[in-house]
């Protein structure tokens, strides 16, 4: 009797690490010379999974986004999952921007993943969408390893996490 093996594909960022990266960003902008005397702020809303940035001008906003992304990389937060919003002009020269964290695989991306797996022609591999995850199952563990390697090489615009491997 053949048993089927499976794994789940998901995405997301550890919110505690995001919080740590935001705190490091705030600490750095309070100490950097080019931010002295400015009203630059970084706020993290855990419930909405978004970061709100405010700066005095466009130059400082670009520097603020750069510092935030650098801190995210150092903390191991996938930068691919960050969606940097458009700059919104405030009073005077001040600008605001919202950075949204992708915490789940959207439906259209999940369909792209399942379509890519099916088009590749793996033998006896089935991909199904389960809410905000994609489950890949097959009787062959080797085929699942091949699917993982294939998906790591593809770019779906988000960082993919492989978990819940059952063999």
Residue ranges and their predicted role:
Residues 36-47:
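Short edge beta-strands and adjacent turn/loop segments
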Residues 1-37:
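N-terminal, positively charged regions that mediate nucleic acid binding
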Residues 19-34, 68-69, 106-118:
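Short amphipathic alpha-helix segments
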Residues 45-58, 130-139:
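Short glycine/threonine-rich beta-strand-turn micro-motifs
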């Amino acid at each position: 009797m053949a048993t089927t093996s499976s794994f789940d594909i998901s995405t997301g960022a550890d919110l505690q690490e995001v919080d740590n990266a935001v705190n490091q960003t705030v600490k750095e902008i309070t100490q950097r010379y080019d931010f002295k005397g400015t009203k630059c702020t970084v706020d993290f809303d855990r419930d909405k999974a978004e970061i709100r940035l405010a700066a005095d001008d466009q130059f400082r906003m670009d520097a603020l986004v750069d510092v935030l992304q650098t801190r995210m990389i150092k903390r191991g937060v996938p930068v691919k999952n960050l969606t940097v919003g458009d700059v919104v002009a405030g009073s005077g020269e001040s600008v605001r921007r919202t950075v949204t964290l992708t915490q789940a695989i959207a439906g259209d991306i999940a369909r792209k993943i399942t379509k890519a797996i099916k088009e590749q022609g793996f033998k006896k591999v089935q991909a199904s969408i389960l809410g905000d995850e994609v489950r890949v199952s097959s009787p062959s563990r080797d085929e699942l390893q091949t699917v993982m390697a294939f998906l790591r090489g593809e770019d779906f615009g988000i960082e993919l996490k492989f978990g819940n491997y059952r063999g």
